[in-house]
Curated annotation (Swiss-Prot):
Keyword Magnesium: no
Subcellular location, record wording: Cell outer membrane
A family per Pfam: OMP_b-brl
UniProt KW Membrane keyword: yes
Sorted UniProt keywords: Cell outer membrane, Membrane, Signal
InterPro entries assigned: OMP/PagP_b-brl (IPR011250), OMP_b-brl (IPR027385)
Signal peptide: 1-23
The protein, known as: Uncharacterized protein CBU_1260
GO cellular component terms, A-Z: cell outer membrane
Chief location category: membrane
Organism, scientific name: Coxiella burnetii (strain RSA 493 / Nine Mile phase I)
Length: 248
């Protein structure tokens, strides 16, 4: 699905940019034919989502070990993604850029099951945890200018801050008595925050409207780590965005 989104957005943007250039007639000046050196600012907005993951782990409940199953809630883990950045272009082909990115929260659904306590034969409980995400990155960008158009690839590192919001898994415990006795259970999971330094990469195409203003469409990815049921879990963060650059 992600591949289709990237291809579709890129193709649409490229068609729109090309159509706009043709509609304006022949281009007398290529805005890429300058020294290219100087500072610039950039803003991006678009669509973010995380990869689907699932996993199993063991948790302690009243002194008894239960099985916890976790999986990504892909429907809720997608939405608005935004980034602001400042950079310096050494020439038309290479620049350094640092930015702050807000990611749409990720969600994981969890449930626990098993036997607990001598008086209870089975326990079933479930819940949903929200993961808030933002990052600060440092990226190197290689650009290939083609008249007023340009293509670019970028790579670097991102510090990703995550906050796992506290939540409660609720459900029932059923005793082996006759008749069975059903009781409510609640497993509270506290909030936690962590920071990660992870690789980030991106690719995109753009068009220089003037010597100072450019628009682009791009895809970027922060490579996560760990399994979804581990304490060091960070999902892969994907974003498809439209960008606007102003060159000083």
């Amino acid at each position: 699905m992600l591949k289709k989104i990237v291809i579709g957005v890129t193709a649409t943007a490229a068609f729109g940019i090309g159509a706009g250039a043709l509609a304006g007639g022949s281009v007398d000046q290529s805005y890429n034919n300058t020294s290219g050196a100087g500072f610039y600012v950039r803003g991006e907005a678009g669509y973010g989502l995380v990869d689907k993951k699932s996993g199993t782990s063991k948790v302690n409940f009243t002194g008894v070990t239960l099985t916890e199953n976790s999986h990504t809630n892909t429907k809720k883990s997608r939405g608005f993604n935004g980034r602001v950045a400042i950079g310096y272009a050494f020439n038309p082909y290479f620049s350094l850029e640092s930015g702050f990115t807000y990611y749409h929260p990720a969600y994981r659904d969890v449930n626990i099951a098993g036997s607990a306590l001598p008086l209870f034969s089975s326990v079933q409980a479930e819940g949903r945890q929200k993961i808030n995400l933002y990052s600060i990155d440092l990226m190197g960008k290689a650009t290939l200018p083609i008249d007023n158009f340009y293509a670019f690839i970028e790579g670097g590192v991102a510090y990703v801050h995550t906050k796992f919001v506290a939540f409660t898994e609720t459900g029932t415990a059923v005793s082996p008595l006759l008749p069975p006795v059903t009781s409510s259970v609640a497993v509270k999971v506290p909030s936690s925050s962590k920071g990660y330094i992870r690789p980030k990469a991106g690719i995109g195409v753009g068009y220089n409207i003037t010597q100072n203003i450019g628009v682009d469409v791009s895809y970027s990815r922060v490579f996560g780590q760990g399994k979804i049921n581990n304490t060091n879990y960070l999902p892969n963060l994907n974003a498809v965005t439209l960008g606007l650059t102003y060159k000083f």
